[in-house]
Regions:
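Membrane-cytosol interface segments of multi-pass membrane proteins
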Residues: 1-216, 347-381
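Alpha-helical transmembrane segments and terminal signal-anchor/GPI-anchor hydrophobic tails
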Residues: 219-330, 337-358
Length: 381
């Protein structure tokens, strides 16, 4: 198995970078005149809109780019989550040498281990409670703020229960059920934890690659039929839409640079980053390329991590991103609160004033919630 290609500090820095993209995207894409993203479905008119904005840039260009590309922080989170699962549950000393050889050798034979349901259920319960601990503090605070501010949502019993149970992603019309919207991520992560423990945990690499190819293949079929369809929307709301970056995280933890190569040279890594960014932009302009963008997002992530650790004059940025990674969980659950409060400022014309207040208040509130969440006992495995 790969030994710590991504250090804990590097993982925190990448989480920080990912959450910056996510929480800025989740503000910018709510603004009417700003380019919309292709997160769950592929809308050609959104890419045409982006091309038009790039051809005629104005003062809002950074907001357009954050709105269109910021949601790709989610694949980075999925990649890091899978990487962390493998490093935690599959690294030595949990496995014997024979088990590791069978699992990680590229030419290894198929496993025939039987499944004991008690351990998987304990694993799923533990990770559900970890997600619940993270979600509940933000959900309670958000619903109270939502109720006392203009435009409050009409909540229904099924929506509340499915949110707390983290099965809202599988219900029809998830766009209308999940509120606040970013909380769809909790249902997605629970599904991926289940898939990992039942299908991929300590299994031959072929299981992971096979599931990735199956999910990508079905998505392409849906895309060829109608990339704007509700079927595509529901598909990508669930684990199938996140299987590519999640699977890459598993494989990268096991095989390292056989999966995603870094160059261990700052200059070469910079060129690699530029190459990835160019590919991400160009592939985002058509449905087939859009399907594979998360791969290059993950590659860009490991290149950035390597670059941040090797270039001394980037150490200040590295430390800031590390700290953002530490508060990323709290920032994820609290940014819908501050968005609801400050977005009217941007909608009424002063986009950057509202955005700046949102950034400052979100980071401060996330730090406070991080301290609060430390007081909540962790679930026992």
């Amino acid at each position: 198995m790969n030994q710590n290609i991504l250090s804990r500090n590097a993982c925190n820095a990448l989480r920080g970078l990912a959450i910056i993209g996510i929480f800025l995207h989740n503000y910018c894409h709510w603004l009417g005149p700003i380019v919309k993203e292709n997160e769950y479905q592929f809308f050609q008119h959104n890419t045409d809109w982006l091309l038009q904005v790039m051809a005629n840039p104005d003062i809002n260009l950074p907001v357009h780019l954050l709105s269109f590309f910021g949601h790709y922080g989610v694949p980075v989170f999925l990649f890091l989550s899978a990487y962390g699962l493998v490093m935690k549950y599959e690294a030595k000393p949990h496995l014997s040498a024979d088990q590791q050889a069978q699992m990680y050798n590229i030419s290894g034979r198929k496993q025939s281990w039987s499944i004991s349901w008690r351990k998987p259920l304990r694993f799923i319960r533990y990770h559900y409670l970890k997600l619940f601990k993270m979600m509940i503090v933000g959900f309670i605070a958000f619903t109270m703020i939502d109720y006392i501010t203009p435009g409050s949502r009409h909540y229904e019993v099924l929506g509340i229960v499915s949110m707390l149970g983290m099965f809202n992603n599988v219900l029809p019309n998830p766009d209308n059920i999940i509120w606040p919207g970013p909380y769809w991520f909790f249902g997605l992560m629970l599904q991926l934890y289940i898939v990992y423990r039942l299908l991929l945990y300590r299994r031959h690499w072929g299981w992971t690659v096979g599931l990735m190819l199956l999910c990508i293949g079905i998505q392409l079929l849906l895309g060829f039929d109608n990339p704007e369809s509700e079927a595509m929307n529901r598909y990508r709301y669930n684990f199938m839409g996140g299987m590519l970056p999640f699977g890459l995280g598993i494989l990268y933890a096991r095989y390292g640079e056989k999966i995603l190569m870094t160059f261990h040279s700052p200059v070469t890594n910079i060129f690699g980053c530029v190459f990835c960014i160019s590919l991400i932009y160009s592939l985002s302009l058509n449905m087939i390329g859009w399907t594979f963008v998360p791969f290059f997002i993950c590659l860009l992530s490991v290149l950035v991590a390597d670059l941040l650790q090797e270039v001394s004059w980037l150490s200040g940025i590295y430390k800031v991103l590390e700290w953002m990674g530490v508060i990323s969980a709290a920032l994820f659950v609290t940014h819908p609160i501050t968005r609801k409060i400050f977005i009217p400022i941007s909608r009424h014309g002063d986009i950057y004033a509202g955005l700046l207040l949102y950034i400052i208040s979100s980071i401060c509130l996330a730090w406070l919630f991080t301290q609060l969440m430390k007081k909540i006992p962790n679930p026992k495995y």
